[in-house]
Amino acid sequence: MSKVFKRDFFNYGGMFYFYFFIWAITFAFLPIWLKDNAHLNEVQSGLIFSGISLAALCYHPFFGYIQDKLGYKKNLFAIIAGAMIFFGVFFNWIFIPLLEYNFWLGLFVCSFYMSLCLYGGVGVVESYIERVSRSNGFEYGHVRLFGSIAGATASFVGGILFLQNPESIFWAASISGAILCVLLYLAPVKKDVIEKTKTNNAVITKNDVFKILKLKDFWFFALIIVGTAAIYDVFDQQFPNYYVTFFDTKANGIDTFSKLCAAQTAIEAILMIFAPALVNKIGAKKGLLLFGVLTFIRIAGSAIFTSITMLSIFRLIA
């Protein structure tokens, strides 16, 4: 393994780590925080998450087009990383006052801010690092492993922080955002790679973007995403509040849930080592079908069984 390979691999792995640390520590405990600290009911919390997803739909077409134009340039990634520094400020000092002033205003601002950083921004982060990994000759799936490790760490640490002070998880996210910015700055892309990209890449026009919308396969793929990933996200958003109701105290429920999430992402990290080989063997289409089946089993099992043990087992799936 060359010196450059080591530096790039761990640099971009570190970027994945701190990005998904923010993702995990936020979304694992946000449903509980919205209920207990922001004093929102289940319907209002659902609207918050729906707003974030809707904002992502607005961001994605533009982010994809802009990132294709930028190629290896880090401008858009830098905007997303910079915005993540303000998680602590936003949730502790801005979001709740906005909700108290006007719920819909708070919903609107939160949706576009959170989606910029996470639901909308994740595509930029993953596609950029995937592109860099190919140009530097290392396996993207192995770099993505750092994200799974971050999930396990964030879930465990987040549970401890949340029980001591719920607001502290957002300050932890801000610190991670600052480290992410430093790692992004320290990960320069070679000029020859940028020039090669300019030479080899075909010019992407607006007509090319609109032609995609006319493809039948594109809409079938979108339907698969809506039927699996979107439902998966809704399930994950509502599960924490549901899970803790089976415990004698909410503190015990939160503590167990954080450890369960840590165990899940640790298992995910191990599986990520073998995931690239599996997907290469069975193909992307069968990989998506497998994901859909596992998602169905996870959600259906959680709806049928009501014991803590069975709920924990189904939470570990997918």
What are these regions (language model features)?
Residues 40-51, 138-143, 171, 246-266, ...:
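Loop-to-transmembrane helix entry
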